[in-house]
């Protein structure tokens, strides 16, 4: 890194910034109402440098809420507060219940799909409720 800086007028950038650029995440976030991200474990490290925190920073800068999903989710009030501060408004575990890690890993795709379908249903109901006149 240092040699590139000195020899080629390069600049240091956080890895998440490069990933967001390569994925055109800023453009995708601009048209999204809600951003969903995830990783293996949503925990005390998540707000401080893991990929979901970088995505949350981007979404927060555009006024978009972020939902994070993970194979394991820590429900510590301090972690929840830090996640909220980072822009992550809700977390969901994809694990359907207690199971051995190998079993959970083989069901990852199915569990992500089921969790995202449940989140989509929840968002749909919330939209319906918010558009109804209140009495």
Predicted features and spans:
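N-terminal loops that bind phosphate or other acidic moieties
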Residues: 1-135
């Amino acid at each position: 890194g240092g040699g590139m800086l000195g020899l080629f007028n390069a600049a240091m950038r956080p890895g998440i910034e490069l990933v967001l650029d390569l994925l055109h995440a800023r453009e995708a976030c601009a048209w999204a109402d809600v951003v969903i991200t995830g990783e293996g474990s949503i925990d005390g490290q998540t707000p401080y440098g893991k990929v979901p925190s970088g995505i949350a920073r981007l979404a927060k800068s555009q006024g978009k809420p972020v939902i994070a999903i993970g194979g394991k989710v820590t429900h510590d009030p301090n972690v929840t507060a830090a996640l909220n501060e980072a822009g992550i408004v809700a977390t969901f575990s994809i694990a359907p219940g207690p199971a051995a890690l190998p079993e959970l890993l083989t069901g990852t795709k199915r569990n992500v799909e089921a969790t995202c379908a449940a989140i989509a249903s929840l968002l749909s109901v919330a939209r319906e409720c918010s558009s109804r006149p209140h009495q």
